[in-house]
Amino acid sequence: MGIHAKLETVQLPLLVSCLFPPLTMPAKDVQICPIAVDTTVFRSRTWDRLKFEIEYGLQRGTTANSYLISADKIALFDPPGESFTDNFVGTLIQRLDLNSLDYVILGHVNANRAHTLKLLLSLAPQATIICSNPAAQNLEKLLADAEVNNPIQVMKGNDHLDLGRGHELTFIPTPSPRYPGQLCTYDPRTEILFTDKLFGAHVCGDQVFDEGWTIYQEDRRYYFDCLLAPAAAQVSAALNKLEAYPAQTYAPSHGPLVRYGLRELTRNYQQWLSEQQAQALNVALIYASAYGNTSTLAQAIARGITKAGVAVTAINAETSNAEEIKEAIGKSAGFIFGSPTLGGHAPTPIQTALGITLANASKTQLCGVFGSFGWSGEAIDMLENKFRDAGFSFGFDTIRVKFKPTDQTLKMCEEAGTDFAQALKKAEKRRQPKSALPESESARTEQALGRLVGSLCVVTAQQGELSSAMLASWVSQATFSPPGLTVAVAKERAIESLLHKNSCFVLNILQEGNHLGLMKHFLKPFAPGGDRFADVATETAENGAPILTESLAYLECRVQQRLECGDHWVLYAVTDRGALLKDGVTAVHHRKSGDHY
């Protein structure tokens, strides 16, 4: 019998074969599948968005992958977070006598995972915890109030653990600012590399492995851009370490296991990392986080910066030394500080980083401040006042978030990051000397390119509480059957994050002679998170996006493909329905140069 014939889905208390899923998918379950000799994956699944974090923004669900090696010794990798605790532990008990569990191996440690660990370790008091030294220090704090006394064994680079039957595990520390205790593990018996946060994707489905791996390209790129791009230097160092291990399968914490597209995904990571490290401008993003909220904000701001073509050097002040902070400030065109407020103050590592920055930063560097708080937020005010008194200019209004961030908060942070990056790029352009050379071939080409004309349109989108819009003229019909069109969207546009595959939008076509008001409205700058539709007459389309009632016509569209083209995404969308609202002709945008809109 083949591996896939043994695939199971467990939703307590019933066992259901995932080969024949129910018509209505359960909100959460645990899928079990043997993946190699002595090795099984437990995929805790949800089809809903798990958290309000930018990395879950595609809203395609996720899996929290745990792995069990049952050799002479038994080891469990990466129990899931609090959202899956009951389902996972209940399912594990059905498959394993927890008194026989020898090791719990942790790729990383955070407060979310600690909830599951407390229950699991109370049921398996004999199990030894395997983790890195930073993870062990964090774990001792997180488990301080729990009645568990499991031994902790710290693993360093190239340390080994023999489970028997050829499963002699090797451990590879791969720290990053957000996950300073990250630990990858290689099993030579199965040639599986357990990669924790590397090579994952937030997507939920029945497929355990990545057959037809190209369908996951967008999910994996988005995951990389949100989670790993701000730590490009550390991720690049991690990949260099992992090259020494001849893996045939990547076993990540989230999404399908990587087997069929392993080489291509590895090459993609190397390319994406090279692109980040080659950016001309860099922002130092320095933060500390007490409960994870400030780091969530930092991740959203970083996403906004990197999508605008500026690199980010993320610095976790709690785990970085003075030289690292000084070097990051020295290489950056701007810096952003994020802090929680603890007892009315900023954490000591943030105060230390502040002193280093004030002593070494140039007043030409742009700055920004953000943070989360429970009651008063004094740390955020302190940082803002210190930088303002020192004469620094701010790239966005200070962001203050009470308790946990929401979808709207994260969108505001992303847009603030984009504004920050755009301000840096404009300043850099002003500093560049103007050429005194005669008209170049490229200038003549730009003039010719500018003679291409396009219909003036407004693209509008709505997802839950989030909405956005942009003026567009790079629009063209692409197909007759099905009726389809293409629209080019700059990577740094705020609406870009709402226009991924299967997303819906409305293309509002403007009318000649009645377009200037809408054109001026959507050309004006909006504050991060600002309402694009204030004082604009709209109706709601069947796909949920706004229709501008003053437009000539509209088309309800659904994104089918995204093609990365330089500094733009070219979207191919099918039109589900549309209507002519007025008699008239389409407004057309005429340009003189192809180097701007």
Swiss-Prot record:
One of its GO terms (molecular function) is electron transfer activity. Its cofactor is Fe cation. The keyword Ligase does not apply. Its EC number is 1.-.-.-. Residues 59-254 are annotated as: Zinc metallo-hydrolase. It comes from the Bacteria. Keywords: Electron transport, Oxidoreductase, Transport. Residues 449-597 are annotated as: Flavodoxin-reductase-like. Residues 283-421 form the Flavodoxin-like domain. Binds 2 iron ions per subunit. By homology with NorV in E.coli, may be involved in nitric oxide detoxification. In the N-terminal section; belongs to the zinc metallo-hydrolase group 3 family. In the C-terminal section; belongs to the flavodoxin reductase family. Mediates electron transfer from NADH to oxygen, reducing it to water. This modular protein has 3 redox cofactors, in other organisms the same activity requires 2 or 3 proteins. This is Putative diflavin flavoprotein A 3.
